């Protein structure tokens, strides 16, 4: 698949286009231009390194939304075996913006739950652009309860702009469904490891992200509101989104410094979409390390640790003036 480049990546896109053109010429010519191709490839790689070493929060937001970024099912295919999808909330409907089912991770039975966006127009509409309705969150709750019953660890993958704000969703209890999930996750008697793989949009993300360990991919985001939404409220213009992204502190490094996430999983050069298999390999190691941390821990110790972790959120430090 041809890589889609973002606006700020245009210098890289131009170099890559030149490289592709030279490769095409080389295939149809006796002239050896391999040295020039190698030189331009190194230049492109260095340019990518320099660009990605100095990303703004707004640019990170764009990468988190990249249309070719791996979604939940991509990671399911790479990280898990024997996946069997489970459907429906047993109350109203089956919301396809949240997917989940039984699987094995490194041979161990587990439950997998995650947001799922679409790759084309038809699938995006089918998945509601990754914005769950109440029945999606109730499906997630059902699967969490099932995992708890059989003592299975839970892996969740977060990638949503937010919970769907439609009238029907509100009528069916959107806020209640999210709130109930927060309560359920806080009380679960089995480990839950959450990973933010793209957009972590407000309560829509939090509803499957209250974990014993929260991981975050290097170029993903996690925030109470989108930069555009924040800008529209504060400055009455979505054009101020870059400033809003800076103020929101939505990047992995900022959230790690605040203690809101536990680990940052580095991405391949250029983002997860440039090397999905490489990204999956790095994430596999991080998930295995996190799961190992909770194996052998008693239920009481697990829940007490989770409680203390949740209670630590929002604490602040007092400093002397001028410190």
Swiss-Prot record:
Reaction catalysed by this enzyme: N(6)-carboxybiotinyl-L-lysyl-[protein] + acetyl-CoA = N(6)-biotinyl-L-lysyl-[protein] + malonyl-CoA
Listed pathway(s): Lipid metabolism; malonyl-CoA biosynthesis; malonyl-CoA from acetyl-CoA: step 1/1
All copies of domain CoA carboxyltransferase C-terminal, residue ranges: 39-293
Subcellular location: Cytoplasm
Keywords associated with the record: ATP-binding, Cytoplasm, Fatty acid biosynthesis, Fatty acid metabolism, Lipid biosynthesis, Lipid metabolism, Nucleotide-binding, Transferase
Pfam families listed in its UniProt record: ACCA (PF03255)
Enzyme Commission designation: 2.1.3.15
Cellular component per GO, a single term: acetyl-CoA carboxylase complex
Function: Component of the acetyl coenzyme A carboxylase (ACC) complex. First, biotin carboxylase catalyzes the carboxylation of biotin on its carrier protein (BCCP) and then the CO(2) group is transferred by the carboxyltransferase to acetyl-CoA to form malonyl-CoA.
Family to which the UniProt record says this protein belongs: Belongs to the AccA family.
Record note on quaternary structure: Acetyl-CoA carboxylase is a heterohexamer composed of biotin carboxyl carrier protein (AccB), biotin carboxylase (AccC) and two subunits each of ACCase subunit alpha (AccA) and ACCase subunit beta (AccD).
Protein name listed in UniProt: Acetyl-coenzyme A carboxylase carboxyl transferase subunit alpha
Organism: Paraburkholderia xenovorans (strain LB400)
Lineage of the species this protein comes from: Bacteria, Pseudomonadati, Pseudomonadota, Betaproteobacteria, Burkholderiales
Gene that encodes it: accA
């Amino acid at each position: 698949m041809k890589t889609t480049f973002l606006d700020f990546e245009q210098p890289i896109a131009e170099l890559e286009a030149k490289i592709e053109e030279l490769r095409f010429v080389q295939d149809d010519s006796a002239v050896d231009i391999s040295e020039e191709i190698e030189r331009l490839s190194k230049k492109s790689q260095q340019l990518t390194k320099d660009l990605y070493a100095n990303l703004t929060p707004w640019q990170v937001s764009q990468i988190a939304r990249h249309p070719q970024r791996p979604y939940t099912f991509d990671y399911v295919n790479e990280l898990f075996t024997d996946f069997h999808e489970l459907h429906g909330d047993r109350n109203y409907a089956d919301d396809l913006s949240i997917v989940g089912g039984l699987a094995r991770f490194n041979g161990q039975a587990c439950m997998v739950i995650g947001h799922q966006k679409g790759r084309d127009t038809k699938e995006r509409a089918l998945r509601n652009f990754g914005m769950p309705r109440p029945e999606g969150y109730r499906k997630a709750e059902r699967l969490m309860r099932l995992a708890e019953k059989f003592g299975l660890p839970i892996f969740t993958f977060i990638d949503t702009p937010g919970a769907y704000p439609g009238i029907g969703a509100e009528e069916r209890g959107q806020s209640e469904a999210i709130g109930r999930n927060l309560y359920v996750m806080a009380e679960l008697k089995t480990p839950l490891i959450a990973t933010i793989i793209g957009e972590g949009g407000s309560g829509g993300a939090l509803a499957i992200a209250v974990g014993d360990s929260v991981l975050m991919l290097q170029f993903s985001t996690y925030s109470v509101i989108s930069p555009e939404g924040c800008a529209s409220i504060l400055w009455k213009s979505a054009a101020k989104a870059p400033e809003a992204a800076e103020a929101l502190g939505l990047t992995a490094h900022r959230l790690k410094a605040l203690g809101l996430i536990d680990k940052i999983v580095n991405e391949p050069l250029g983002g997860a979409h440039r090397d999905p298999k490489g990204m999956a390999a790095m994430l596999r190691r991080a998930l295995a390390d996190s799961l190992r941390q909770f194996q052998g821990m008693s239920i009481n110790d697990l829940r007490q640790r989770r409680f203390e972790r949740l209670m630590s959120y929002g604490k602040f430090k007092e400093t002397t003036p001028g410190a």
